[in-house]
Amino acid sequence: MNFQYLVKIVAGSYYNISSSILSKIINSVILAGLYYGFLTALALKTSYILLIRAMVSENQNHKAAATTGLILGQLGQFLSIYYAPLYIAFGRPYTLTVLTLIYFLVNLFGNNLDKNASSFGAYGNKIRTLEILCIFLNNLILQLLNTCIFPSSTLARVVNVYLFRCNNKMVFLISSFSAWLIGQILVLMCCKLVLGRGQNKNSIRALIKKYLVRNSMFFLVVNCLFGSSLFILTIQSLGRIPLPIPTQNLSEISRIEKREEERLKKSGVAKEGKSTEDEEDLSHEKDSFKKEPYSKLENEDEEIEKDIEQAIGTLLFDYKRWTRPFRYIKNNQFEQAVRNEMSQYFFGTQQSDGKSRICFTHPVNLSMFWKGISFLLRDKNYSNKLTRRWVQRNKKKLKSIKSDLVNRIRNLDNTIKIEFGTPRTRLCTCIHENETKQEYVPEEYDPLLAGCYRGRIKKEQAIFQKQENETLTNPLDTLIDVLENNTNTQLFKANPIGKQKISFEEELRKKVPRWSYKLITELEQISYYRNPPDDHDIRTRKAKSLVVFDPSKHPNMETMEDSGNIQNKSSDKTINPQNNLTNSKTRTSENDPDDNTTEKEPKDDKSYSIRYSHQSDFRHGLIKDSMRSLRRKIVITDLFKGNVHSPLFFERRKKKNLFSFSGLLKLKQLFITWSAQKEFWDLKDSKKKLKIKDKKQQETKERIEIAEAWDSFELTQVLRGVLLVIQSSLRKDILLPSLIIIKNLGRILLFQTSEWSHDFEELEKETHVPCTYNGVPLGEKEFPRNWLTEGIQIKILSPFCLKPWNDEKKPLPASENFCFLTIWGQETDHIFGRPRRKPSFFKPILTKLDTSLKKINVVQFFKEKRTPESNIVKEQKVDDLSDNILNEFQFSKREKLEAITNRTNLIKTKLETIAKEKKTVTRDLDKNLSKKSLKQIKFKLVSNLSLFQYFLKLFIQKIYTLFLRNILLISGLLKKILNGEKEQLIDQYCSKNEKIKKVHKKFNFILNRKSKLSTNFSNLSQAYVFYKISQEMANFSVCKLRSILNQQVKAVFVKPEIKESFARYGLIQIQKMDKKNLQLRTRQWKHWLRVNSQHHLSHILWSSFGAKKENWRKKIKRCNKFNKQSLQKGNSKGNSNLDDSKNRNKNNLILNKNKKDNFEKCYRYDVLSSKFIKFEKKKTSLFHRSRISLTRQKQILYHKNMSQNFLFALPKNMLVKNLMGKSERIHIPYIEKDLDRKYLSFENIQFSLKKKVNIESWIPLTSRGNRTKTYNYELLDELELMKFIDQIYKKEKEFLFPCIERNKQIRNSKSKYSFIDWMGLNQKLLKHPVTNLELWFFPEFVSLLNIYKLKPWVLQSQLLLSKLTFNKLSSQQQNQTTTKINTETKNQQKNRVENEENKETENQQNAETKNKQKSKTENEENKETENQQNDESEDDPQLAYIRSFMKKHLLFQLRGESIFKKSGFKNIQILCLLLRLMNQNEMLFSSIQREKLNLHIMPEIGIKDLTLEVLEEIGVPEFLKEKRVNFEPFPLYINKNGKFLIYQLLNMSLVHKIKYPTNNESRNQGVITTQKNNNVASHIPENILSSRRRRELRILMCLNKKKKKCKGTEATNKSFSYKKKCAKIWEEQKSTIEFFIWPNSRFEDLTCMNRYWFYTNNGSRFSMLRIVMYLPLKNY
């Protein structure tokens, strides 16, 4: 312990000694002098430039003069630090500025003169001596002026402080002077070394002498360069020195205020002197209008000159620079800023009389320094003589005070009680009436009585006291007086109270020191409504504006504004009774030369969005031309610095420690117990999350840096924008199409189907949208304003990605399926982000190859072969062990031990022998097999090489033949198509497909022994077994199956349903007992066939079906086992519309099973079912069906599975994907299935490569109707239709419901061609191109076409029939419409009867006259409606303006809340894009469907309900409080065309609309109940009537279903007479006759309706159009 104590003492003493020595060395005067001397010598100054120029020249005199001048100048400056007179002479700023400016002007002009000695002649020597003197003086004066490159006065201040502190001042001076000399010598030596190397090289020296020194221009250029560089550096150093010119005092009134007051006075006098006569005003206006252009030009020239003078003056000579503040603190918008005048000294606490008291002592820096040192001086007690004196004085004072108190207390008893008041001074206030009288201030507010109080006393004015007693006069009198006099001065007289208020406030106002001018920011300059200033004073952050909305591009806005202004003017004229006064005021203001408001400037109503840069903005908030603080300690290393700081504060930066002690402690605590493993993994996951966050932050930083790097220079944005545009055009037009072509050519070479159409469809989906620099999207073809200078981004929507084959995967949502384009043509997820990885083209190909190769079984060449010797050894081993175990019990213990040892030895020896045998066997096998395998491989290679040449030849020939075949086929097909051989092509194409699609399916589930089905055949159903047998058509004989099934024993186990199905095919003979059950089943078949007619099937199938009748009859006769008698009986017992087809096809029962023809497969079931009906022996009428109670107003049926708000509807159970690949086999749909499919020809839809349409997008896949309800209504009744639509609208409550209004221009349309080409009947009229060309070149369309024709799935829903106008009709209008309809119907029916009896020529003339009359009436109606609309807009122009703008755009206001973040800004981007687009409706619908626009944010107030009263009641701020976003939307509308309405009208009469409305019970249950038979034969009116009258009957039945009974006067037509006959025969089922007739009609009847409906008389192109003009439809 003692030893340690001694060591500590020694170490402490050593430390104290070393620290004392070091402190003495550091604080020594010599070292400080050396340090400051080197600093003064090595300070960079402008005078070194003159020294370098002298050193470069080879003249020794110049060098000597420059060095001596520099040393002497620095010596004088050095002495001025320690000598006060020199310091005052060279340190004052005003003297320096005066001397330097004069000196540098002389020096600049002197350097530019030609100084050749030859030009001066005899005076050359004298001039050379003057040059030497000038060099000497230049170097001396520059050193004295102290014009440093980095100007600072710290060195002089530090030297002054040290001289004040140190005691040995002479030692400090000598040491600093010696250090200064050493520093100067070092500087000169360095200059000589640097410049001497260049002179020593002979080559450089020779070149300088040869070319430069001899040339006189060289000296001039060098002198000019040095002079200009000197001038620039000195001005830079003089920038901080104040100018020696007296500036304006800050307390005085500014000149700007004076100018404003003078201008107001002049304008006021001018306005008073002007007359109010109209004639004089007009003459003055004409003269001023004539002089305007000349005066404007003169004023513009003067303003330009003034601006140039001001700019030059502010650059060179700004006299207010030193008076301006560094930072501008605004106090009020309407006043100048208050000056925070603060002296360099402040009040600090010091001790006086032993107490700390406030005193005016020292600067701020010293007080801060004292606070920093004070904590070091707490422990040390310093004795001071002053403190002892203060203590003694205080003690004496206390003694004197105590003695006085004691004496007073003693004298209290002796004194006499005398009351006297102590006089006190108080504050008084003067009264206005009598200044002599005064009033005391209340004691509460008197500072002399109650202490100081900073409250303000409010004096009661005499005016207010008088006004309380006076009665109120009529306020209209004062207004009339003001209007009659019409002077600005009397306006102030009307309010004397306010005038005296102002004077009273001026009395109490205190003058505060303010700046002499009001400084303005850039935003304030823009926000000036009138007379904006020329320039702003305070710097703002750098920003770039972007135009979001430009009203000039929308002419509707401008027209509405103009109309609104005109109407406002007219209304003002009517309202104002005194127009003369208002006109005089406006004219005087226009003629006033001082007011600048008369000049109408163009209104900039554009809405902008501001973009700020991410750069560090150090001049934000600074004042122009003000002094800047020198930041000497700042070091800028990077190109852009966000936070600039000095190197002294590097420790305060964020440090990333690799090893932290706190982290190690946490890990130690975690690993103490095993239960802490979960915490450890949680910590690991948190670290991963932190790493991911850091990566994201780094990426954002990189993106910001890249963006700012592009934005830093001007030309970079131009270059980047051009490159982006080039890359987008290259990508869309060249690169991607070429890749698609290469891919599809490769697929063709590899004998695979091409994917041209799919790839080009996806490429067309890719759209390039130009965006702003921040990524705000604009229109598709509209670039942002000034995009070359401000920057541009290109956004790619649904980018195209090339794939080896197109999979049916779900596409990405629209919010994720976009990217941005880079300069190099790559895709990025973010702006200026890293390029994203694309899925590789070859990766799926390689994976598919790998999977296919793995399936191949690799031949196992090397297999283990066991020798018989090893087996023998094992058998011996087993025998020996068994014998030993049996004999163990016979021996004693010793013998047992010996036996055990022997046995172990035997086992060891045997194991060793077995191991040796294995080694020998395996070695031999390896050698033999390796030799054999190598030989086999060599042999195979040699044989394959010889055959490889032949293989190549065969491969090339095969490709060649395939290409030739395809080319010949395409050319032949084109010729046939052009010649019109369509039917032959269809048959050929189908037969080829059938040959290719031969599939041989075998009984794999029975033959395979390893299958699980072979063990348990009970799991198999009989239907499945027979289905498999039916598929195997070629290898299985039907006769064997027939013999097996006819056996009584085996037929018992067969189910009855399967028996019936085989009986239909003729495989089983049906017994009598089974026929009863079969008859019930046949009724369902019979009902299905009667309900479904040939219109369910395509015309292609019917044509091919009719062509192959004879072949079918031959094949059916072979397999027919039924008796002809039963068939004849079935035919005689009933009559129907299908009798003809049944009699023709008596023997067509079963089709041939070997030939797999698609068309035969489709229709063999139809033939079978038709024959099966006749097989039945029951006496029932074939025309038996479920009766439906149809009323007058039931015409169109709504299906339960149809969605009722889409143009094209799809049932729930029918999908396009389910139909793909099922064209080979089509089954009969039972009644349980949905029978809502109908055929629609593909020729109606014109496909083209330019406009690809997604058919699946037309069809909704869901249905909203839960219950089956039949909504049937009359087409003629408009009011009932409106009620029906209102019911549907209330139920579904969909916000977006299309509003379709009636277009009156459709009646006047006299187009010859109709919109719909139904079944190709009017093909000659439309002059169709060959539509099948595209389908033959693109086989993908063929499969879709065939599938659609076999199983069509599209249905026109009821939306086409509805007239969706939701306008509320008043009761009067409804009555008027009903009366008009009734009158028109009567008149038109009369005309119809008369016209039928007349000739065709008379009919045409009548039609033409009626058309003309109708066109006139319709034009008049259109004019009336337009006039009504104009009247409404004129009555209320503001409402008209609001409504028109709301119809065009969706505008909304935002309130900055935390909840409204992402979704709101997405809506903003989409709405900005919609404002820019040309076709806004398409983009708007798509954005709503993709759920990008959030329409739930909109308010519930409609546009029609919006009035001025509503707006006033709501109020803007209250409405914004209720809802975060203020929408004023307009519901989406549909553009109505003539074609659309024609299509809507013609679809009312489509086949599937009224064809088969069955009972609701049968559709819900799926089973048809049997009814009693009516033994009444069914009559078909079509077969009775002639062709002409048959068509007339059909049209009249469609159009006149409202009337049930026929009157005698209206029954002249044969159709009506026939209708009466039908009523007598079959009175109960009138509606069913109409219902049955309509399905057999075709589009020929609809074309007649088209002619009859729109009054078109040109019927020459149709043979059947000879119908008389009938009554028009009442709705139209």
Swiss-Prot record:
Residues 562-586, 1123-1138 have a biased composition (Polar residues). It comes from Cuscuta obtusiflora (Peruvian dodder). Belongs to the TIC214 family. It is a multi-pass membrane protein. PANTHER family: PROTEIN TIC 214, PROTEIN TIC 214-RELATED. It is found in: Plastid, Chloroplast inner membrane. The chain crosses the membrane at residues 24-44, 70-90, 93-113, 130-150, 170-190, 218-238. Involved in protein precursor import into chloroplasts. May be part of an intermediate translocation complex acting as a protein-conducting channel at the inner envelope. Keywords: Chloroplast, Coiled coil, Membrane, Plastid, Plastid inner membrane, Protein transport, Transmembrane, Transmembrane helix, Transport. The keyword Protein transport applies. This is Protein TIC 214. Residues 1372-1390 have a biased composition (Low complexity). It comes from the Eukaryota. Residues 1384-1436 form a coiled coil. One of its GO terms (biological process) is protein transport. Signal peptide: none annotated. Part of the Tic complex. Its main location: plastid. Residues 264-276, 283-298, 597-610, 1391-1402, 1409-1426 have a biased composition (Basic and acidic residues). GO terms for cellular component: chloroplast inner membrane. Residues 264-302, 546-610, 1123-1151, 1372-1436 are annotated as: Disordered.
